[in-house]
Each structure stands twice: as C-alpha cells, then as structure tokens.
Amino acid sequence: MSTKTARASAARSSVGSSGSRRIRSTPDERRVTILDAAREVMVERGSDAARVTDVAERAGVSHGLVHYYFPTKDDLVAATMRHAAGVGVERLRARVAARTSGMDKLDTLLQLAVPGGAAASDAWVLWVDAWSAGLRDQTVRHVHEELDNAWAGTLVEIIDSGVAAGEFTCPDPQQTATVLTSLIDGLALRLVLRRRGVTRAEILRILRETAAGQLGHTPPS
C-alpha cells in the first residue's frame, strides 16, 4: 500500500469501539477532536508521559489517524499547546474588546490570567508543561514564545490605549507589560502548585496594586 493510500485510509477511519467520544466528520473537526483529547491526556500525565496511543483512545480514533494529522509526537505536542493556548488568547481578546475603560480591560486580563476553576487550572498545568518541554524541544519553545508574546502584546495594547485616553501614566508600556506578565507567571505558578497560603483573591489584589502603581491609577476596591 502506498503512503498516500495509507493516509487516505487513516483519514477515513471511524470511531474506535473503545473511544470515549464520537469523531467529527470534517477534516478540521477531526483535527480539533484529536487536539482536545491530547490536551486532556497531557494535563493528566504530562507531555513526556502522554502516548499517541493514549490520545487515539481518548479521541476514539485509530492510531493511524492521529499520525495522519501529526506525523510525530513532537508535532502533536506542539500543535496541542498552540491550540489550547490559542483558544485562551482568542477568549482574552474578545473579553477585553467588550470592556470600555482601560482599567476594566486591564482587570479583565488579570482575572483571565489567574487560574480560577478547573478549566483555568488545566490551562496553566499545560502552560507550565510547555515551559519544561520548551527547554528540550525548539518547536515547543517557539510556540510558547509566540503565545506568550500574544498575551503580552494584548497587555501593551491595553496600556497604550489607556495612556492615549488619559487614564494611565506610563513612560514605557513594554517594560510595564514585562513586569506584570512576569509577576502573573510567578504568582499563578504558586497557585497551580497549591502553595499554602496562596489564594486567587490575594494574587489578584497584588496584581491590581502593582498595576495601579505602574500606571498611576487607583486600584479597584
């Protein structure tokens, strides 16, 4: 059987009898189904321990179909991290766009950045895994940098618009964004690791006070 024929056969594969979800019909939907399953497996086991077989079983598809879309495990890991974090970036931008004032936009970003609930915690577990995997895998490192820059870029845009509107005073929005994103990373990591005495409310208070000090604005009560 030729490689082309084998790939076509894999793409037509139906849901496995042991699969936990029903495969979607279009190629793009099949790809998303696999990525969603990979995200779940990677959150539970870590990217190093996750196997393609585990992902195929979780997605309810054949092993061959996973390889049809993602030839190597490294391809799958990088694509999963880009997909999961990309959804978060899109959600962030939509929520921020719905706010009017600069401080409301900033507070929306801070609340979305700090884990709250199972879904947000899972996203951070995957993000921390990406930090670790990026030390060894250049592709994952580039994906991580790309998505980190997207978050930081949104923050810079918020600060710039606030300065233009006269809400903020900030001589260097890029530097302020670096300070705030670094603080978010460190504090959110402590929350994900369930460090004693660290709460989401306390982290948000620290972030709001720091942001207000950096931007010459009184933090919300």
Enumerate the language-model features and the residues they cover:
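Amphipathic alpha-helical segments used for helix-helix packing
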Residues: K105, A118-H142
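Hydrophobic/aromatic-rich alpha-helical bundle segments in the mid-to-C-terminal region
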Residues: T139-E145, N149, V163-A211, T218-S221
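Generic hydrophobic, amphipathic alpha-helix propensity
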Residues: R30-A38, V55, T80-A84, G88, ...
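N-terminal intrinsically disordered/low-complexity leader segments
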Residues: M1-E29, P219-S221
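Helix-turn-helix
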Residues: T33, V41-D75, A79
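Short coil/turn segments at alpha/beta junctions that flank glycine-rich nucleotide-binding fingerprints
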Residues: E44-D48, R99, A120, A165
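Hydrophobic alpha-helical connector segments
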Residues: A79, E90-A123, T176-L180, L204
